[in-house]
Each structure stands twice: as structure tokens, then as C-alpha cells.
Design a protein with these regions (language model features):
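Extracellular modular ligand-binding repeats in secreted and cell-surface proteins
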Residues: 240-270
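A short, amphipathic beta-strand motif
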Residues: 223-231, 235-239
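Conserved ATP-binding subdomain of kinase catalytic cores across diverse folds
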Residues: 1-19
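Surface-exposed interfaces of beta-sheet-rich extracellular modules
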Residues: 175, 179, 258-284
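Conserved "repeat-terminator" motif of extracellular CCP/Sushi domains
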Residues: 221, 285-297
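Middle-to-C-terminal accessory/interaction subdomains
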Residues: 18-226
Length: 297
């Protein structure tokens, strides 16, 4: 395994925890030689960096509005388990979003990334990738997918609330020993207030990020897409990278960035057609379709 780290605490120099840094620099140099206009760009880049993994990593950093990165808090690894492709790790995200962060839920992190130095190899994969149509399309749709699922407001808020519920019971003892033992009540009040502020930040973030993606990447708008299958239990429908467990299912995507929708029938059923709507005025008999969605459907 090659396990690498870069932080301000080590003079912002990439160093090897295990293995060597030279293979990373060799692969970064080879990546830089790729032509983003080539239709083979993604497949070639994927030989050096796990591209699916990398996109999810970038999305996480961006959704959390983390600006203590990409010059700091870098952790990279590769091994035989990754087919010797580099993967980036999330760490030290505490400076993203209020109440403790350098940014808040309104911060335009997409614009922040667009302004980064392409000589930084950790963000250059994204900067160069965004010049490639396949990468750009995937990044936008994958960001939409995650905001419709993993980063859905109800889910994120419930996770934070659960962590708060577990922690709050221990905090009086924490403050009594490690804080100000003469002012535990005020410290508890501050702790609860920070929880409420963080809940607000989480609840507002996705809406703001969608606006930033639309504005900064020149998209036409945001659309609600609803998918369903008839009869119930007849099969599954995959939109972009998401296969919802329950239907009807609604997610928000972007007008100006085509999305692939695929129907897969269960045993004993057959796909017949997509029903006509405002996008195609007659039924479509292809099980997999790629289309731009300009209005709510």
C-alpha cells in the first residue's frame, strides 16, 4: 500500500506514511498529459485515479463548504484492492459550515473550486475533468443524485440529531472536568445553541448548492423529476446512479445536463414503453433513454 498525507502541520509537503510519494507524482504527471477533449479521457484517467470515488470525494468536500482544503487535510492511498488507482479520503471537515466553520450554508464552494490553482494535483483532476463532457455530465448528475438521497435534508438532519442526542447527556461531565466547572449551565446552553445552528445550516445547504451549480456551471434551471412503474412491482427504474427502493420517487435535476433513465423488468414482466409527456409526445419504446429534462415531469 502507498498511504500519503499532506497537512499544514508538516509544512504542506506530501509525505509517505506507508510506501512512497513518487508513484503519485508519476501518475499525476501522466494524468496532466491527457487531453480532456478526448472521448477516452474518463477511461484513461480512471487508470490513475478511481474516478467514481474521486467525484464522490469532491462532492462531499463541496457540499460541506470545506475551505481548509485542497491545500490541507490531504490523505491519499492506493493498493491492490484499488487496482493501484488513487483514492482520496475525507478528514478534518470541522471547518465547513457554521457554527464552527470558516464558511456557512450560503458559501459558493463550486466557485471556490473553479478558482483553485491547477498546479495543485488534488483539485486539478476536477478542474481538468470539468473540461470533459462525460466527466462534467457525471459530476453534475452525481451531485444531484446525492442531494436527492444521501444528502437529503431529512436524512442529514436525523443523523446530526441522533449524534446530538447521544452526546448531550455526557456534556455536563465533560464541561465539569475539561471546561469551566463553575459555569456548566452556560456551556450547556451554548452547546444546545450550536446544535440548533448546525441543524439550520444543514437544512439550508442543499438548496444553496443547487443554485450555485446552476449559476456557476451555466445550467438553465432545476427540475423535479418523478418516476414510477406500472403495475406496482413490475420492475426497477434507475435514474443516473440512483435506483429508488420505493416509487413514485421524485428528485431534483438540472435542465441543460442530460440524464439517463433505465427501466429493468422483474422476472415475469417485460418493459413496454415510457408514457408520453411534455418531453416526448408519443410513447418511447427504448428501455434506456438519455434526455434533457427542461420542465418538472
Amino acid at each position: 500500500i502507498d498511504l500519503l498525507s499532506q497537512s499544514y502541520w508538516n509544512n504542506s509537503v506530501l509525505r509517505a506514511i506507508e510506501g512512497s510519494v513518487e508513484p503519485f507524482y508519476d501518475d499525476a504527471q501522466a494524468f496532466n498529459a491527457l487531453d480532456p477533449a478526448s472521448p477516452e479521457f474518463w477511461d484513461l484517467a480512471d487508470q490513475y485515479f478511481d474516478m467514481d470515488w474521486y467525484v464522490d470525494y469532491i462532492i462531499a468536500e463541496s457540499w460541506m463548504a470545506n475551505t481548509d482544503w485542497p491545500g490541507n487535510n490531504i490523505r491519499i492511498y492506493r493498493s491492490d484492492k484499488t487496482n493501484y488507482r488513487w483514492r482520496f479520503c475525507l478528514l478534518d471537515m470541522e471547518l465547513g459550515l457554521l457554527p464552527n466553520g470558516w464558511t456557512d450554508c450560503y458559501f459558493d464552494h463550486i466557485n471556490h473550486m473553479l478558482g483553485q490553482d491547477p498546479n495543485n494535483p488534488y483539485i486539478n483532476v476536477w478542474l481538468k475533468g470539468m473540461q470533459n463532457p462525460r466527466f462534467r455530465n457525471y459530476f453534475i448528475n452525481r451531485f444531484a443524485d446525492l442531494m436527492n438521497t444521501s444528502y437529503k435534508i431529512e436524512r442529514i438532519s436525523a443523523i446530526e440529531q441522533s449524534m446530538f442526542n447521544q452526546t448531550v447527556l455526557e456534556m455536563p461531565r465533560e464541561y465539569s472536568r475539561w471546561g469551566d466547572p463553575n459555569n456548566v449551565a452556560q456551556q450547556m446552553t451554548d452547546f444546545v445553541n450550536r446544535h440548533h445552528e448546525f441543524q439550520f445550516q444543514l437544512s439550508e445547504r442543499t438548496g444553496q448548492v443547487r443554485n450555485h451549480i446552476q449559476a456557476d456551471l451555466g445550467l438553465n434551471g432545476q427540475v423535479e423529476v418523478t418516476i414510477d412503474a406500472f403495475p406496482a412491482g413490475a420492475g426497477t427504474i434507475k435514474i443516473s446512479t440512483v435506483t429508488p427502493d420505493a416509487r413514485p420517487w421524485t428528485g431534483v435535476y438540472f435542465d441543460g445536463n442530460p440524464v439517463v433513465i433505465t427501466a429493468t423488468p422483474n422476472p415475469g414482466y417485460a418493459f413496454v414503453y415510457w408514457d408520453a409527456n411534455s418531453i416526448f409526445t408519443s410513447p418511447d419504446f427504448n428501455a434506456s433513454i438519455e434526455l434533457n429534462i427542461p420542465t418538472d415531469e
